[in-house]
Structure formats: C-alpha cells, structure tokens
C-alpha cells in the first residue's frame, strides 16, 4: 500500500490526528525561511509522543552534514530529507539518519542524475517535486505527468520514490493509480493556512491515497 507522508507539521494536534488517520511518515521543516518552520526543540516535543510505527522526517535546506546530524539527534528525527544541491556525495556518507534525497524536477532535468546519485551514495529513497526557484516544497505546484513518468521509470529496480507537489484529497487517488509511486507527500494541499492542517482534508487525503496498492517497502 502506498506510503503517505504529511509534511510541514507544527502542532501536536495535527501530528496526532495524522497518525490516527493512518499517515506513515510525518515531516518537520527545519528550513528557517519556510512558513512551516519548526524549531528542533518544539519538534522533539511532538515526536516523542508519536507511535513507533510512524517515522519522523526532518526537512533540511542549506545545512552542513554535522548540523543535520545534530538537529536530528536533538529532535529525535528518524529520516533526513535533504533538499540541498550543494552537499556532495561524501557529505551524504557522514549523515547518521536514514536519508531521502529530494529532487526538484523541471524540463531540463536529466533523470540519469538519480542513478548516478544512488551509485555514489547508496541512497535509494527519493522525493520528486516540481521545480520552483528559491522554493523547497510546499509550493502547491504539480510535477508534469510526463516528467513524473520518466523519473519513476528511471528508479525501477533500485529506488523508492515519493511524489510531491500539487497533491490534494481530490487528485491523489488518480495520481497514485497513474504513476504508482512508493509514496506521496503533501503539505499545502491539505492546509487551511501555512502549517495548519484542515483535518477533514487530511483524513480524506490519506484514505484516498491508500485505496491503491503500491510497492512494498523500504521505510
């Protein structure tokens, strides 16, 4: 069954309800410029109450490997989601948590870059989002379907792919059936305002996403 990641959480209530509704992963954004930013200390207060079957994911932009490790330890993060193109392959080997590598995909994107990254780092779990200058997730912009097909085709046989960008409770089931991702990621698509989840939309999103079977599991 497809994995569901609810991202950009900043309140205990939203996190607990996401777990009750069936989310598999919860995302906490440590990028200070994001409207969904949460401090490591506040994230830790939420994460320590999560059930053991729900993974915590830290979203990072512009952080060095050592700082990522420190934040993950402080906030009790299971998985580091890395959006930073400046980290080299060697930097990824220094990271202690499990890793999801984010790729912002546009028309000029060379899908072979994903395989090269996997071969250099061993990281085999990815999140694909639509490219938007200076924005890292939560944009509400959908990834072109043809491009999405290409990236998911590229990782067949070695990778697990999450789809993000422009998903909501109305389009997620159709998207999952069409692209068959390992998982889906949503932030702005189920919000009443940045960082505040609309509970009815969140419940419906998770239910609709999980109607379709998908790849069995990495995380």
Swiss-Prot record:
BP GO terms, sorted: L-tryptophan biosynthetic process
Keyword Transport among UniProt keywords: no
Enzyme Commission designation: 5.3.1.24
Key words of the record: Amino-acid biosynthesis, Aromatic amino acid biosynthesis, Isomerase, Tryptophan biosynthesis
CDD domains: PRAI
Catalytic reaction list: N-(5-phospho-beta-D-ribosyl)anthranilate = 1-(2-carboxyphenylamino)-1-deoxy-D-ribulose 5-phosphate
GO molecular function: phosphoribosylanthranilate isomerase activity
Family affiliation: Belongs to the TrpF family.
HAMAP family from the UniProt entry: PRAI (MF_00135)
Name of protein: N-(5'-phosphoribosyl)anthranilate isomerase
UniProt gene name: trpF
């Amino acid at each position: 069954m497809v994995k569901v990641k609810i991202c950009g959480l900043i309140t205990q209530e939203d996190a607990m309800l996401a777990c009750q509704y069936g989310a598999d992963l919860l995302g906490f954004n440590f990028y200070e410029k994001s409207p969904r930013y949460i401090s490591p200390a506040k994230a830790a207060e939420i994460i320590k109450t999560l059930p053991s079957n729900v993974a915590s994911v830290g979203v990072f932009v512009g952080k060095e490997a050592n700082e990522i490790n420190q934040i993950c330890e402080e906030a009790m993060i299971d998985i580091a989601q890395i959006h930073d193109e400046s980290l080299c392959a060697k930097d990824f080997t220094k990271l202690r948590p499990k890793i999801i590598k984010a790729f912002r995909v546009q028309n000029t994107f060379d899908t072979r870059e994903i395989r090269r990254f996997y071969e250099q780092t061993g990281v085999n779990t990815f999140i694909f989002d639509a490219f938007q200058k200076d924005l890292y997730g939560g944009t509400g912009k959908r990834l072109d379907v043809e491009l999405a097909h290409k990236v998911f085709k590229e990782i067949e046989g070695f990778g697990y792919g999450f789809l993000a960008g422009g998903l909501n409770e109305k389009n997620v089931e159709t998207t999952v059936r069409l692209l068959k991702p390992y998982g889906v990621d949503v932030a702005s698509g189920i919000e009443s305002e940045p960082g505040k989840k609309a509970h009815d939309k969140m419940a419906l999103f998770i239910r609709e996403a999980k109607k379709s079977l998908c790849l069995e599991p990495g995380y």
